[in-house]
Amino acid sequence: MRARLGLLMAQQQVMLRAITMKNKPEEMLAKSPKGTVPVLILPDDTVIDESLDIMIWALQQNDPDDLLHKDHPEDLASALELIHHNDKQFKPQLEIYKKAIDPNQPQTKYKYVLLLVV
């Protein structure tokens, strides 16, 4: 989602190709042996296979809304720090929380806990 939003905001035209993760195309694996998505393959065969890197690349090409804060690099650094915190600390904790939900408990119990976490 992050990569797609970056590409959209940067008005970059790309060809989207939906793949089945259980049946990854050989063409994709030849370009990006890591086998993860998203993958952006540039005309010069450069491969970008991290969503944040794709977003930043796209906005470096065209950033009509100044989302990279070119005149205030400290703002970009703060935003990237927040993204890193979300990816490395919050998301794993959220996954643990989601897997621990007991369907026999009332939903309000979990909503209250989530409000405390956020």
Regions found by a protein language model. Give the residues of each.
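GST-like domain detector, emphasizing the conserved glutathione-binding G-site
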Residues: 1-114
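Acidic, glycine-rich loop-and-strand cores that form catalytic or ligand-binding grooves
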Residues: 117-118
